[in-house]
Amino acid sequence: MHVIVLGSGVIGTTTAYYLARQGAQVTVLERRAGPADETSYGNAGQVSPGYSTPWAAPGIPLKALKWMFQKHAPLAIRADGSFYQWRWLAAMLANCSAGRYSVNKERMLRLAEYSRDCLRTLRADTGIQYEQRTQGTLQLFRTAAQMEAARRDIAVLEECGVPYELLDRNRLPTAEPALARALDKLAGGLRLPNDETGDCRRFTLQLADKAKALGVQFRFNQQVEGLDVRGGQVAGVRVGGEQLAADCYVAAFGSYTRGFLRPLGLDLPVYPVKGYSLTIPMTDESAAPVSTILDETYKVAVTRFDQRIRVGGMAELAGFDLRLKEARRKTLELVVNDLSPGSGAVEQAEFWTGLRPMTPDSTPIIGATKYGNLFLNTGHGTLGWTMACGSGQLVADQVCGRQPAIRADDLALSRYGAGGQAGGGVARAQHNAA
């Protein structure tokens, strides 16, 4: 069976790898010069199932209003001139009830825990190295109110069997010794010992090499012009003046997947949520985290790689705007200087931004469509790295007709009531991802 995977970020590359492991002939089409060159390039570095929490949550509407007037707010909404932006926001607000939050968090935890297990198996099988650390992660609370909210939230962790430790202020240095310098700013923390960290881009580059060794063909610098469909099936991909045909197709274009598939009558509720990061050369190991610390107030993570510190987070809803904004850099600098002062040469940092493909319920869209040979793997939001291996394995199982190891039907596009029935004739989808 020949499968074409569209996109070579961490999601597309893991999908290609797992397909090849199951014996498929795989071709990956990518418009950039190599894998992990966009959203997977500079993310926060967390593989954190325990922090798989929906952005759509009780209290978020009121918080969003307050954040509009804060200088270092974790969320900013800027009109992009489209009606779709407001429709997407309305759908997100509809998911802010306690009931929807509980359902969505369970889905996210289920996939994220499975994905971490898949990553561990892959690491054992291949020996892949990507500056990973398996020392857990620590969410930091600056206020008693945040601590109390965490106590309410851990009920879901207990239901899903996720180990955790709720730490008061004085116990924080037992998990992260460098925090002894910042205790006066903190109320406590939530430690998740089974979470991990690592450089997503390095992982993706190495996994692409391992996929090539299994026979996967990567075609870079390819501008995908569209999909042709006939009789309820994808007939081929138009790229560079030629049509490439396969038995099955997997769309993993991240934030651009929605625009690519709309001409086919597939309305994916995916919106680009802009995030930022700094990658800082480490200068004082004793002042740096041993793993990841996550500032709950600013929604910013500070992650330790080998000789670098990655500071990433925040969310802007502003369409496909990729401009770097100095105000966001200052927020990242504020957090790292506050929690890990003197740990790195902040003035030498690489400043980066990327677009995370987010759904209104924060759960990715994985699985079949109304076209019998077209599958989706997108919409992971801020958890693409966390969920990548599990998502790739699920899609590979579905494409190859195998029973997935976990429930996956509620991750499909059909949960939104979208798609309908494929019609006859010829339809074309265009990849307008400039």
Curated annotation (Swiss-Prot):
It is an enzyme of class 1 (oxidoreductase). InterPro entries: DadA (IPR023080), FAD-dep_OxRdtase (IPR006076), FAD/NAD-bd_sf (IPR036188). Keywords: FAD, Flavoprotein, Oxidoreductase. The keyword Ribonucleoprotein does not apply. The keyword Flavoprotein applies. It catalyses: a D-alpha-amino acid + A + H2O = a 2-oxocarboxylate + AH2 + NH4(+). Its cofactor is FAD. GO terms for molecular function: D-amino-acid dehydrogenase activity. GO terms for biological process: D-alanine catabolic process. Its EC number is 1.4.99.-. One of its GO terms (cellular component) is cytoplasm. FAD binds at residues 3-17. PANTHER family: D-AMINO ACID DEHYDROGENASE, SARCOSINE DEHYDROGENASE-RELATED. Oxidative deamination of D-amino acids. HAMAP family: DadA. Belongs to the DadA oxidoreductase family. This is D-amino acid dehydrogenase. It comes from Bordetella parapertussis (strain 12822 / ATCC BAA-587 / NCTC 13253). The gene is dadA.
